[in-house]
Each structure stands twice: as C-alpha cells, then as structure tokens.
Amino acid sequence: MIVIKAGGRVIKNNLDGIIESLSNVGEQAIFVHGGGDQVTETSKKLGIEPVFVTSPEGIRSRYTSKEELEVFIMVMSLISRQIVSKLAYKKKVISLTGADGNSVIAERKKKIIIIDERGRKRIVDGGYTGKIKKVDSLVISDLLKSFDLLVFAPLAYDPEEKTLLNVDGDQMAFAIATAMKADTLILLTDVEGVLVDGKVINKLTSKEAKELSKRIGPGMNRKLLMAGETIENGVKKVIISSGLVQDPISNALQLRGTVIM
C-alpha cells in the first residue's frame, strides 16, 4: 500500500496529469492533496483577503479564520470531488476528511507565535488550524477493504470543538503513512527532489535526512525531518519527486527524485 501527497502548486498546474497517474496505480493507495493556491483565488473572488503569517523558523503559512475555513472546506471538497469523478469509471474511490469515521483527529492550535511586520515575535490566536493527534488505522483499513483509492483533503477533525480544521497536507500524509505502515510514501512537489547546490540528492538515510533538514530552506526542511521520523517509525521509503512530469507517480516509483530509506 502506498500513500501519495501532491502539493497545491502541483494540483493547480497538473491536476489532470495527477488524476491520470492515479488511474494507473496498480495497488491500493491513499492520496492526500493540497490546494492552497485555489483557496487564495476563491477567497479573493468572494471578497475575503487571505492572511499569511510567518513563524520564527521562517515558514509562511495561511492564517485560517472562521470565514477562511469555510472557503477552505469548500475548495478542498471541490478538488476531492473532481478527482473522484474523473477516476470512478476505473477505480472504486471515495473522498474523505478526517471527520469521516473520526479517521484523522487533530487539536486546534489555541495560540501561535508569529513574526510581525516589524520583525518582532507575537503570540496570536491560532485560528482554525490544527495539529494532528491521531490517525485511526482500523477505520482506514476497513475502508480499504471496499475501495481501491482513498482521497483525503487536508482537513482533520477536532472532537472537542466539534469542527474541521485546516492541517498541513504533508503532516497528514506522514501521519497516515506512519499509522498504516505504508510501504512507500510519495511526496509530489514542484521540484525534482531535494536540491543541494542545484543538484538533486538521489539517496538519503533517515539520519542523513534529519541532518540535512537543519541546513536546507523552509518547506523542504520539514519534509526531510518528517521523512526521517517516518522511516524510523516503520515506513519503508519516502520519495520526494516532481509532480509536474508525465505520469508523476510512476516516475517516482522508478526512484526518480530523492529516496529516503
């Protein structure tokens, strides 16, 4: 069983290619998708100006207000349905959020630390973003008895506050892959792999991935850190590869990109 995650830029620029590639996967799979660019576009059309914040580590992320959460749910649900409708002729596929069967549980971030426009640290309300606390592998295993492909939007469920939460798509993919002890986790990005001095690093051990995460830019550093931890927790390999090429999943399974084992 494999877990595949495609980031928002990949979804925006190569959704049809991703769908075609998913149709050719010959084993059971779980697909986690992003869609941040589409959320931003839709928010602006609705007159809601998106807000982004920067963490002390330099990571820029969406600030999810209650109003923005509603747009996020709407857009992510649309993307999920587009994927399902174009694959249903060939595969038994279902779209899900973490609220379905309480499959992915998260806790709302009550407070977050940001760097303001003056470069100072500030503590602000966390909005409707969450940190994943639990993946119910039994629920997901039962679903895989009936379906070939599960499509997850990056929305987890907070049972305490009875709400869906925006969660990091990478975090969701890593959490699901770890809980399911997946053979392979594929991260499809807008680059060919982990780049150092303009060249793709082909292979890394889990230890090397965690070490390199301290010396590489925001975004990829978290992927490498989580990849190292995921390998140590039972996933056989993590592949970071381009989602913009033809048949990107097959391309990744041919170990083109960066392979962490």
From Swiss-Prot:
Pathway: Amino-acid biosynthesis; L-lysine biosynthesis via AAA pathway; L-lysine from L-alpha-aminoadipate (Thermus route): step 2/5; Amino-acid biosynthesis; L-arginine biosynthesis
Enzyme class: transferase
Family listed: Belongs to the acetylglutamate kinase family. LysZ subfamily.
EC nos: 2.7.2.17, 2.7.2.19
GN (gene name): lysZ
Source organism (scientific name): Sulfurisphaera tokodaii (strain DSM 16993 / JCM 10545 / NBRC 100140 / 7) (Sulfolobus tokodaii)
Gene3D superfamilies: Acetylglutamate kinase-like
HAMAP family in the record: LysZ
Catalyzed reaction equations: [amino-group carrier protein]-C-terminal-N-(1,4-dicarboxybutan-1-yl)-L-glutamine + ATP = [amino-group carrier protein]-C-terminal-N-(1-carboxy-5-phosphooxy-5-oxopentan-1-yl)-L-glutamine + ADP; [amino-group carrier protein]-C-terminal-gamma-(L-glutamyl)-L-glutamate + ATP = [amino-group carrier protein]-C-terminal-gamma-(5-phospho-L-glutamyl)-L-glutamate + ADP
Protein name listed in UniProt: [LysW]-aminoadipate/[LysW]-glutamate kinase
Functional description taken from the UniProt entry: Involved in both the arginine and lysine biosynthetic pathways. Phosphorylates the LysW-bound precursors glutamate (for arginine biosynthesis), respectively alpha-aminoadipate (for lysine biosynthesis).
Entry keywords, A to Z: Amino-acid biosynthesis, Arginine biosynthesis, ATP-binding, Cytoplasm, Kinase, Lysine biosynthesis, Nucleotide-binding, Transferase
